[in-house]
Amino acid sequence: MVKYEDKISLYDAKGNLVAENVPLEAISPLYNPTIKSMLKNIKRTVAVNLADIENTLATGSIGGKGCKVPGRTLDLSVVSNAQAIADEVEKILKVSKDDDTAIKLINGGKQMAVQVPSERLEVAAEYSVSMLATAMALKEAIIKTFNVDMFEGSTVHASIMGNYPQVMDYAGGNIASLLGAPSNLEGLGYALRNIPVNHAVATTKKNMMNAIAFSSVMEQTATFEMGDAIGSFERQHLLGLAYQGLNADNLVIEFIKANGKGTVGTVVQSVVERALADGVIVVDKTMGSGFNMYKPADVNKWNAYAAAGLVAAAAVSCGAARAAQNIASVILYYNDILEYETGLPGVDYGRSMGTAVGFSFFSHSIYGGGGPGIFNGNHVVTRHSKGFAIPPVCAAMCADAGTQMFSPEHTSALVGAVYSAFDEFREPMKYVIERALNIKDKL
């Protein structure tokens, strides 16, 4: 069912036109088959680090930092027996002969991607079943493969699960998921926002447009779960996903190209010029000084144009530096300049600029406890702009040339290796657009 008259042109990650006059709802999480598939698979996919399990057992370093127990070591050739372990895990997890259980070994058996059968999620209240069922199946598989006795079973357990349940998550463990532990969520419906920037960047192999798309899909889909993208506010979030996340009408790439030798300020200029040309904003009145005050002809579309400009500003500024550290300042002052220039609200009606104030303090200023890449939409500092503030941070981390202490390679190697093996996670733009074209005439 088409609610909105909006039509968008879709472009690929390199700015090539794919299709015109596509209904806005074709990229909606409620209709788009790729987004639905991504959400289903993100809940049932678990990354396992078999190489680190082997090392953990060999050194007795169970439970994470500071938890080395020299007397509790096991010399097990986990990686060289990865196929046997994978076969046993699959056997344990399967519910029926033809279900969708899937096991994939990566990097010669050093890592393993486990997709639990959908039937297990259907009888669970939330997604923890994927991590827990995988962990217990893996533990049993290792015990069986190496004939581990009852006195060492707990050591195998700790090498997989880490410090849980002494801690709220799987700290020190060797399994991971993009969504993290639900016990760490900041509020109701925040699970899809609990994906660190570095995870998105690693999953998409530092491809900027795909990292932006991945982040935007997760952030904006979360707004449907949280009750934000409902009724009068649904169109705002769909336009944000289309223009900021999926480069609708090629806005993002055109803004970047036009300002390849520009600044955050020149990106603002491009956004205002394009919004005027497209009739998204109009001159409200001209002051005695000649300064124009504007008003939106379409306030939701103005927000979408501004959001597209924000990720372009991140690409221009952080790309010029080849460093991500200034992204909080980019988000803050892009919005500040935009508001002064137009008299209109910035991205997400001030919330992204407000987010950037705290983000700047906690990632860069007096405190500076963590680099931009470790933040997510569930973080107490960056949670406030729902859907619009995390994609530009992903753009910045893709442009970073290794300046960060908390780099994607450091924080997200396992997640990146496993989840990038799935096409729809690695190249979400391509597959969201493909399936949008499949359904556009059926809405």
Curated annotation (Swiss-Prot):
Keywords: Cytoplasm, Methanogenesis, Transferase. This is Methyl-coenzyme M reductase subunit beta. Gene3D superfamilies: 3.30.70.470, Methyl-coenzyme M reductase, alpha/beta subunit, C-terminal. InterPro entries: Me_CoM_Rdtase_asu/bsu_C (IPR008924), Me_CoM_Rdtase_asu_N_sub2 (IPR015823), Me_CoM_Rdtase_bsu (IPR003179), Me_CoM_Rdtase_bsu_C (IPR022679), Me_CoM_Rdtase_bsu_N (IPR022680), Me_CoM_Rdtase_Fd-like_fold (IPR009024). Belongs to the methyl-coenzyme M reductase beta subunit family. It comes from Methanococcus vannielii. Pathway: One-carbon metabolism; methyl-coenzyme M reduction; methane from methyl-coenzyme M: step 1/1. It is an enzyme of class 2 (transferase). NCBIfam families: met_CoM_red_bet (TIGR03257). Its EC number is 2.8.4.1. Its main location: cytoplasm. Coenzyme M binds at residue 367. Coenzyme B binds at residue 369. One of its GO terms (biological process) is methanogenesis. It is found in: Cytoplasm. The keyword Nuclease does not apply.
